[in-house]
UniProtKB/Swiss-Prot annotation:
Domain of life: Bacteria
Protein name: Probable multidrug-efflux transporter Rv1634
PROSITE patterns: MFS
GO molecular function terms noted in the UniProt entry: efflux transmembrane transporter activity; transmembrane transporter activity
GO terms classed as biological process: response to antibiotic; transmembrane transport; xenobiotic detoxification by transmembrane export across the plasma membrane
Record field: transmembrane: 23-43, 55-75, 91-111, 116-136, 146-166, 174-194, 213-233, 237-257, 279-299, 308-328, 337-357, 366-386, 410-430, 438-458
Length: 471
């Protein structure tokens, strides 16, 4: 049996009948992602005002650590207090943390505020995925997933531009004030969009204190995130590689511990014979390979002689491709076509990365820079055409329907930790390259080309492993 167009909801239905719910689910992710990129643009002006340059890296490091730790608690929060209370608690902490950042008299206070923002933001971003299956009809899961994850692309454009504007006007504190205002407005919408009753995953009543917090999983993932983040701080390759290896080991231990304990982050179906583990692995490979974007602005300035603003918009080409790919792919109806698209997505990414590799050169003319932008668009499209369908497959491939929200919540954990690994790996590749900046740029793109191409093994398994799925 194949899916028909009538079984797939429309964008009009999602953004009219479920407008409030869509704003809440996508809004939490947008707040988290926009705040991340906005703060990076504000930091130079912030340091010029309150000092603390030695703590520069920790503003983003502890934000990431806090968000990864919080992401591991999403399903537990839903089961203990329900969807509405989880959102309101996350928004309250995020708003308070934004006020702390806005009023920070020193960098130490700002770092504390950013840590709180990361904790609240990680919860909000995870809730955006985890509640798709319980707040939207199944016919809208794909479009809901596309809308939620598209917020990363939107944030990549809006965050740096907004942060740069506030910084240029000397109003960096006001930027955090605006985040507080947006958080308050969203909090007002939550009771209306999510209803009066606290609802857990799948619509069940929260079970209160009977569901334990996954303490060991939380600690291991927090330690892994910290190791990855600190890996970016040393100026020596050996320390960086060692920290990345330690982080990989911690993630491996996390998987083993999560498999053996009752209070877990990953749904039990991950460890079964189904496709869920391959779905997560495909997403992980895509996120790691996407982190080639970390060095695009740098190489754009040094090899293409672009201005900082132009180089920033060049880097945003990947996000544009991601968003466009998601919107277009979410309209696909045939299960067979969707399976082929998802399976081929890593190869689409690899083709874009290969194009980027062969076009890197010094003193690049406009035509070559246009090819760089095209390569990034292709890379982003490779992610976008698969991501919403991978999200739906994750929710739909669990052995027990009650695991569906846990499967969706784990997507955010996979996304955050994989992105951090990708950024760290990109740094190792660039810093070990011999032969100057052109060789470093080519080496980065080539290394990630190989990684993305290898991802086709996981994507094929993700779409063909479970023969029960319609063809």
């Amino acid at each position: 049996m194949t899916e028909t167009a009538s079984e797939t909801g429309s964008w009009r239905e999602l953004l009219s009948r479920y407008l409030g719910t869509s704003i809440v689910l996508a809004g939490g992710v947008a707040l988290y992602a926009t705040n991340e990129f906005l703060t990076i643009s504000l930091l130079p002006s912030t340091i010029a005002d309150i000092g603390g340059s030695r703590l520069y890296a920790w503003v983003t490091t502890l934000y990431l650590v806090g968000s990864v730790v919080a992401a591991t608690t999403v399903n537990t929060m839903l089961l203990r207090v329900g969807a509405r209370s989880s959102y309101l608690m996350g928004l309250a902490v995020f708003g308070l943390a934004s006020l702390v950042c806005a009023a920070a008299p020193s960098m130490q206070i700002l770092v504390a505020g950013r840590t709180l923002q990361g904790i609240a933001g990680g919860l909000l971003a995870g809730l955006g995925y985890a509640l798709i299956n319980s707040t939207l009809p199944k016919s809208l899961w794909t479009r809901g997933s596309a809308l939620v994850s598209a917020m990363w692309g939107v944030a990549t454009l809006i965050g740096p531009a907004t942060g740069g504007l506030f910084a240029q006007l000397g109003l960096w504190r006001w930027a955090f004030g605006v985040m507080t205002l947006l958080t308050a407005l969203m909090a007002m919408l939550v009771p209306v969009a999510l209803g009066a009753g606290g609802v857990g995953p799948g619509g069940e009543t929260p079970v209160g204190s009977t569901h334990k917090v996954p303490v060991w999983s939380l600690l291991l993932m927090g330690a892994a995130a910290l190791a990855i983040s600190v890996a970016a701080l040393p100026n020596y390759l050996v320390q960086t590689a060692g920290l990345l290896a330690a982080a990989a080991l911690l993630v491996a231990v996390f998987v083993v511990v999560d498999w053996r304990i009752h209070a877990a982050v990953l749904p039990p179906s991950v460890f079964g014979s189904g496709p869920l583990k391959w779905i997560y692995l495909t997403m992980s490979v895509q996120m790691i390979a996407a982190m080639v974007d970390t060095y695009v602005p740098l190489f754009g300035q040094r090899l293409g002689h672009l201005t900082p603003v132009a180089a920033g918009f060049l880097g945003a080409a990947l996000a544009v491709g991601w968003t466009v790919g998601e919107v277009a792919s979410a309209s696909l109806n045939s299960a067979r076509v969707i399976g082929h698209v998802v399976a081929a997505a890593p190869l689409v990414m690899a083709s874009g990365l290969a194009l980027g590799a062969v076009t890197q050169r010094a003193d690049a003319p406009v035509g070559i820079i246009a090819l760089w932008a095209l390569a990034l668009l292709i890379i982003g499209t490779g992610i976008g055409i698969a991501w919403p369908h991978l999200t739906v497959r994750a929710m739909d491939s669990v052995a027990d329907p009650a695991e569906s929200s846990a499967a969706a919540a784990a997507i955010n954990v996979v996304q955050l930790i994989s992105g951090a690994f990708g950024a760290g790996l990109a740094g190792v590749v660039v810093n070990t390259a011999k032969g100057g900046e052109v060789a470093a740029a080519r080496g980065l793109y080539m290394a990630f080309t190989v990684l993305a191409a290898a991802g086709v093994i996981a994507s094929y398994q993700a779409t063909h492993r479970d023969r029960r799925l319609p063809r």
